[in-house]
């Protein structure tokens, strides 16, 4: 039947379920299904922005695309055509990094000669030549995690290489010398690190003074423990704008936020010009969500066995249909335990062959050699049966190997922790999140996952 009303989590947060939600009761578990949201209808004025119609600066940077996607096309006139502050709240996979790239190109265009629009007559086959005043500006991109920072650096560095623009990471792991900072135009950093840089009144004033654009990715984390740091950064930037009459553009990117109006006010966004909110109807790939609750007291061996069984039933059904599945767990040691439990269930049920990689692909020698070299015994054992694990405690080389095996289809089921979700885009048809409580070391207790996680 349908479900109405609000539900309280055990921590007092209210949740409401969307219309059309169905609930099914089984002997040992119950399941709530949230249907796919209907795609948002197209507005009659909506036209995709074609790359060939852009000026040479954008055209050459977005060269491998033919057009911007739906959300990017709607936001393009504001992102690239104005200096308005922006808050973009959109579903995952909406191409927010490219919207940020449009605002970066807007900043670069202001320090380019000749001006990009003066070269619009250039035919599309000719590579434009720009001289960029490299030392005149800095662009700061604040990413929530180091893993994401590395991914953003790689993307922007390769896209903007043709202009000679340097993009570097400045995080707890990656320090930059003064000379490197001076030679870099785009600095990708974490909230905590940028807080340290801007906090020192006598510190890097040259660096801070040259900032023309501040992009805050995953700004919905304002709600989490680290929100205060992000809040401080933004307030400090706004104070700098007022005190020095300098022009710094603020761009916030987030998942679909409930309180987007508050966040946009805080960012100083003009709600009629710079506020863009897209709901789940704009997801490029529709998402159907199933919440499965297992009976019994959470954390007891009996409940855990039941959880593994229900998890296996799901995974086996998906793999039998030819799909790859990622199973997220909340502790490193659980990755191995869950993978082994799923494999054991498959052996008992006689379905293990469905999980094994196809014979013809199992002989990729280059990868086989790398697997043989790995010291991770548990990982190697599981790989034979098409299972694998991924968590931050593994060696970088092993993690990269697992990612490659999964993207080539040689691993059917990957048990991993959330570090994988933050920084790596792997092509899974379905994602299973096993258990909804994580250990919070600051509270010294298990807490519910936030719905954004």
Each model region followed by its residue ranges:
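Conserved C-terminal RecA-like helicase domain
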Residues: 117, 133, 141, 157-168, ...
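SF2 helicase catalytic motif II
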Residues: 191-195, 202-244
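Conserved interdomain linker/interface between the two RecA-like ATPase lobes of SF2 helicase motors
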Residues: 249-341, 388
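Conserved motor-coupling elements within RecA-like helicase/translocase cores
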Residues: 173-188, 396-412
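Conserved nucleic-acid-binding Ia/Ib motif block in the N-terminal RecA-like helicase ATPase lobe
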Residues: 121-193, 265, 389
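A short beta-strand element within the Helicase C-terminal
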Residues: 413, 420-437
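Walker A/P-loop NTP-binding motif
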Residues: 77-82, 98-133, 235-240
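Helicase-associated low-complexity/disordered flanking segments
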Residues: 1-77, 83-87, 112-127, 344, ...
């Amino acid at each position: 039947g349908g479900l109405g009303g609000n539900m309280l989590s055990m921590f007092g947060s209210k949740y409401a379920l969307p219309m059309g939600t169905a609930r099914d009761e089984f002997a040992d578990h119950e399941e709530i299904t949230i249907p796919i949201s209907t795609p948002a209808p197209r507005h009659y004025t909506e036209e995709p922005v074609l790359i060939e119609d852009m000026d040479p600066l954008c055209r050459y940077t977005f060269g491998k695309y033919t057009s911007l996607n739906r959300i990017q096309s709607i936001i393009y006139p504001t992102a690239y055509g104005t200096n308005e502050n922006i808050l973009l709240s959109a579903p995952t996979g909406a191409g927010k990094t490219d919207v940020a790239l449009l605002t970066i190109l807007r900043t670069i265009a202001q320090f380019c000669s000749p001006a990009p629009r003066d070269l619009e007559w250039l035919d599309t086959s000719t590579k434009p030549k720009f001289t960029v005043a490299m030392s005149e500006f800095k662009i700061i991109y604040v990413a929530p995690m180091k893993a994401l920072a590395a991914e953003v650096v790689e993307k922007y560095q390769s896209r903007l290489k043709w202009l000679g623009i340097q993009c570097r990471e400045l995080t707890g792991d990656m320090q930059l010398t003064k000379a490197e900072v001076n030679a870099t135009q785009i600095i990708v950093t974490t909230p905590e690190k940028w807080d340290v840089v801007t906090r020192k009144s006598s510190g890097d004033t040259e660096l801070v003074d040259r900032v023309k654009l501040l992009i805050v990715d995953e700004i919905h984390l304002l709600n989490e423990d680290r929100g205060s740091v992000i809040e401080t950064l933004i307030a400090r930037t706004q104070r700098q704008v007022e005190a020095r009459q300098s022009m710094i553009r603020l761009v916030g990117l987030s998942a679909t936020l409930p309180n987007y109006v508050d966040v946009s006010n805080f960012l100083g966004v003009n709600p009629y010009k710079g506020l863009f909110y897209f709901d789940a109807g704009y997801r490029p790939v529709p998402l159907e969500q199933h919440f499965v609750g297992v009976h019994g007291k959470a954390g007891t061996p009996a409940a855990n066995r039941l959880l593994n069984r229900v998890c296996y039933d799901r995974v086996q059904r998906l793999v039998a249909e030819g799909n790859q599945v990622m199973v997220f767990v909340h502790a490193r040691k659980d990755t191995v335990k869950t993978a082994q439990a799923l494999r054991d269930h498959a052996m008992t049920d006689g379905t293990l062959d469905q999980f094994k990689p196809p014979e013809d692909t199992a002989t990729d020698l280059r990868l086989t050699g790398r697997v043989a070299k790995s010291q991770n015994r548990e990982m190697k054992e599981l790989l034979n049966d098409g299972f694998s694990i991924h968590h931050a405690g593994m060696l970088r080389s092993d993690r990269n190997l697992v990612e490659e095996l999964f993207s080539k289809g040689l691993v059917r089921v990957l048990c991993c922790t959330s570090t994988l979700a933050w920084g790596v885009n792997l092509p899974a048809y379905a994602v299973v999140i096993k258990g909804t409580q994580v250990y919070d070391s600051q509270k010294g207790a298990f807490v519910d996952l936030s719905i954004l996680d």
